[in-house]
Amino acid sequence: MTTESLLIELLTEELPPKSLVKLGNAFATLIADSLKQQYLTTPDTVSTVFASPRRLAVHLTAISVQAPDQIVTLKLMPVAVGLDAQGQPTPALHKKLAALGVENVAVSALKRVQEGKAEMLFLEQSVTGILLAAGLQKAVDEAIRQLPVAKMMTYQLDDGWENVHFIRPAHGLIALHGQQIVPISALGFAAGNTTRGHRFEAKQAELVIDHADHYEYILETEGTVIPGFDRRRSRIREGLETATRAAQLQCIEDAALLDEVTALVERPNVLMGTFSADFLEVPQECLISTMKINQKYFPLLDADGKLTNRFLIVSNITPADPGQIIAGNERVIRSRLADAKFFFDHDRKRTLASRLPDLDKVIYHHQLGSQGERTRYVRALAQIIGQLLDNGDLPAQANQAAMLAKADLLTDMVGEFPELQGIMGRYYAQREGVDETIAFAIEDHYKPRFAGDALPRSMTGICVALADKLETLISLFSIGQFPTGDKDPYALRRHALGVIRILIEKDLPIGLDVLISRAAGVLRDEISGEQGPESSHARPVTPQLTEQLQDFFYDRLASSLRDQGYTVQEVESVLNLRPSLLCEIPRRLAAVRAFTALPEAASLAAANKRVSNILKKSEFDATVSIDKACLQAPAEIALYRALSEIESDARHAFQKGDYVTALQMLAALKAPIDAFFDQVMVNDENEVLRRNRLALLAALQATMNRVADISRLAA
């Protein structure tokens, strides 16, 4: 059957720029998948996605004009139900065949197939392949209905009577199979072969696409539009790099901004603008946020990473003289930067400390009270963490940093740019003469903000960051705000990973259970028997809740370790022991990986699993100790001696943190363990012997599982 390329384009008003890539890919994928399910594609079909500010399109090669005929097998019913004793069709079978429109089919044409204990009747039918027009209509309808759109617009067609629901008003539809228009319709438009190019620079208002394969070429040459998202993105990146090299400056890397700008322009043109150097007195983060968020500009830095008074504009038009475009953008940015300077100057009229009483008026959560209350909890917890880490000045510094950490939430600058919280607090604190350690801790207590972000720079920042994240987790858990599925509105998974990263990467000797217990103590107002911060909101923190929070931490840790390349077995072997000191986990994992390379590893892991199962089934009393006088069989005596020889050294190696040695010493136990299980009956009829052998196995398990539960490594 002959094939041709297929082109589908939806011409619309400007689409949401932050959703364009997702929309374009979804539109193309949904159409291609639907056509494939209807057998209209071929093995040679290749899909090309086009997504520009005003169009979603897909080009598919090798699409059939009609799907091949298909043999369809339908299960009808059991033979016992469909045929009587004489082999004639029953009323039930007649009714079923009539419903399928094949009431005249002969019984001999039906197939009998044994399925389990029942013999079933099947009907084979030849189904004529669907025509492209019908299949494409179904595919386009499904694609429009299933696009990942959070909120649809409702608008009326030209007749003023019919309502249409789509992400933005549509203006046209192309459906071309080779040169032929495919007769489908969507969003109130019948398919044609015409589209529109650039709003201002197209050579003609209406473009005729004479063949599906000529779409991209005609749009670029006649319509002055680059329809492919990736090509536009590459063109913008090249323009940014060229302009940056010419100015001998650096452009800030921002993939999200580059994607957004790519979704805003049809034909990019990179230009350079400037602003008054006087604005550089404002912290550069403020100016950068203004340029990137409000204006979609690319700020330029000098060789030292300092912001300059130059920036790059991505224009959607390419005039012979770009002077007016540059001047217009410079006027706009001047106003924006003046606003930022005003915010900065106005904020500095009040100290951070003077803003603290106002935090009591800011709601943190309607069930948890105000930011002022929260600040008092975080201060108490930060001070405790400081005491756990250092009895010197750290607790007092952590207390002061936590006290000021949220004050910048009340500033005009953070109100305008919430992403600057913490950063502005640091700047304002420095301008007030606050100690540098405290100032940087104000900024750092939000870290890490995202995967791969830097950690707090000082121990003071670490104390406040841990306290802030733990307070968030335990408070929200206490009111039942748990992450579910893909929903995590309070970023609790990110907060947990932040705590985990700080404990591990900063090698902090604080147990996770201790941190959670002390955090729970603060929220229960039971810090060492003293009354904690007063609260107008009850926060019921129960032992079950703290256990649930620990489970949450270990689940996040397991997921993170798997993402880092550790196997499921390696992760389970270590985390099954619930090590409290998370800073030890990388060393334990390294020891487990070294252990698995030993020739004896597989046998020892299997034996450990066997020991674990025996002890579990026997409900062994762990308080029972080994009685050497009751050791009778040569194999059990040999195992006891081998275990005694390595136990002390293995324990000392474990206590020193030499986990590799502690595990590798177990290799000496392979032969005596194998002999024990070959020659000794553990569940002896003699109760004294049985309990003594179980005690020996319990001691063996305790020695083998100090670093990790190696039974988890068994195949």
UniProtKB/Swiss-Prot annotation:
Reactions catalysed: tRNA(Gly) + glycine + ATP = glycyl-tRNA(Gly) + AMP + diphosphate
Subcellular compartments: Cytoplasm
Enzyme Commission number(s) of this protein: 6.1.1.14
Record's GO cellular component terms: cytosol
Entry annotated with the keyword Ligase: yes
Major localization class: cytoplasm
Keywords for this protein: Aminoacyl-tRNA synthetase, ATP-binding, Cytoplasm, Ligase, Nucleotide-binding, Protein biosynthesis
GO MF annotation, one: arginine-tRNA ligase activity
Family that this chain belongs to: Belongs to the class-II aminoacyl-tRNA synthetase family.
The name this protein goes by in its record: Glycine--tRNA ligase beta subunit
Species whose genome carries this gene: Nitrosomonas eutropha (strain DSM 101675 / C91 / Nm57)
